[in-house]
A protein has these predicted regions:
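N-terminal pre-Walker A segment at the start of P-loop NTPase domains
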Residues: 1-16
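Electropositive, glycine-dotted interaction segments
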Residues: 91-242
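Conserved P-loop NTP-binding catalytic core
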Residues: 41-109
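Phosphate-binding P-loop
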Residues: 17-23, 295-298
């Protein structure tokens, strides 16, 4: 399975400069304001970029100036490189190729591409770089690879070319395979369980291609699974029953008044009464969304979940962590958490600590050394072995051994 194994990011929001490897499971911890949300926001931007909606995302994010590290007076571009390899903590980060972009602000507060490059393996086994438009060539020498060449693109375009790019026939398969790895990166956020949340409303029956980021089409998606993927549906139902024993089953059907509509309904043991989504607790409703996401048959290549522990009982967190581990054999997961109990369910290699580092250097008019930034740290079992003989990961977090405390 191809995973996003290595990422370099510069100039994005609180992230001045980041270079880090990623594994099958990545659990981000850190205090409020450290930069977890900004890291997740980068993937939101990437997803919108690949979908052809970069400028809309920039506008909704407050403009280019708000997206650059301390604004355009300090930072003149956002630079990112993403590389793909085999899953696991021991891997060749560059094995399958990569994707590189540089975005710079315009006078009207938009972002435009300075460059956009797909890195791919040439049939001769060297890793080549293919620009997405014709132009001059120049040599590149990344540390991880040899014999690199770059076909530089023209620059100046406002939306990504990778999704619709058609390379030369001789290179088609190699480049197409890398282009297919670039997204989608969907951030799932099941926080809204208010009375007006989409998850509680009647929705379109046929809106079932994928589970929406807010689980707004949960009823339609579950109905599709019931009809086409009964095994996965039963896994979801079983998971819900483990944390909500009186739950018998979902009672999913097209609306009698409009056969193109559907609403989330359910039943409990010993009764034929149909309950609605408003009669589920917030935590139970979120858990149903999470179970559906992680137990579906066709997982997105990379899943990002923001604070999945909200409203869940400790026993539900254990079950959720088990589903995360199971899903990690078919997809890559990036999670943020503030829960000590949830953190205890994972391995040291899964943990990434994010902290805010404020420089002690004075900030002057001609220097930016005094500005703060988000700093990322990975952990491993070897360095924590002695600690883990006596303490859990959660306790080490509370003791600030892992960092990530206010």
């Amino acid at each position: 399975m191809a995973e996003l194994t290595h990422i370099t990011l510069k100039g994005f929001k609180s992230i001045k400069e980041l270079e880090i490897g990623l594994g099958p499971i990545n659990v981000l911890i850190g205090p409020n304001g450290a930069g977890k949300s900004n890291f997740i926001s980068f993937f939101r931007m990437l997803n919108e970029l690949i979908e052809g909606h970069l400028q809309l995302f920039v506008a909704r994010s407050g403009g280019a100036n708000a997206m650059l590290h301390y604004g355009t007076k300090v930072t003149n571009s956002i630079d990112a490189e993403l590389y793909f390899g085999r899953g696991g903590h021991e891997h060749d980060s560059y094995e399958y190729g990569g994707y590189q972009i540089q975005l710079t602000p315009t006078e009207d507060d938009k972002l435009v591409f300075v460059k956009e490059i797909l890195h791919f393996k040439h049939p001769t086994e060297s890793l080549d770089n293919e620009g997405l438009e014709s132009g001059h060539k120049k040599a590149l020498t990344p540390e991880e690879c040899k014999n690199l060449s770059e076909e530089a693109m023209g620059g100046g375009h406002t939306e990504a070319l990778a999704p619709r790019w058609r390379p030369e026939e001789s290179m088609f398969d190699e480049i197409k395979n890398v282009a297919a790895m670039v997204g989608p990166w969907i951030v799932y956020h099941f926080h809204d369980t208010s009375s007006t949340a989409r998850i509680k409303q009647t929705g379109d029956l046929h809106e079932n291609d994928r589970l929406e980021p807010d689980a707004g089409n949960l009823a339609a998606f579950l109905y599709m699974l019931h009809e086409r993927h009964s095994r996965n549906y039963e896994l979801i139902r079983s998971a819900v029953r483990r944390i909500f024993p009186r739950f018998k089953d979902f009672a999913l059907r097209p609306s009698p008044l409009n056969l193109d509509k559907i609403r989330l309904e359910w039943q409990e043991h010993g009764s034929d009464y149909r309950f609605g989504p408003h009669q589920l607790s917030d935590g139970t409703l979120r858990f149903i969304g999470l179970a559906t996401l992680l137990l579906q048959p066709n997982l997105p290549s990379t899943i990002l979940i923001d604070e999945p522990e909200l409203g869940l009982h400790p026993s539900a967190l254990t079950l959720l962590a088990g589903m995360v581990r199971s899903a990690s054999s078919r997809a890559q997961l990036i999670l943020t958490t503030q829960s000590v109990s949830f953190l205890n369910e994972f391995e040291p290699e899964d943990i990434i600590t994010i902290e805010r580092r404020d420089s002690t250097a004075p900030l002057t008019s001609d220097s930016h050394d005094g500005l703060g930034e988000s700093v990322f740290s990975k952990h491993d079992g070897k360095s924590l072995k002695e600690w883990l003989n006596a303490y859990s990961l959660g306790e080490l977090w509370e003791m600030n051994v892992l960092g990530g405390r206010p």
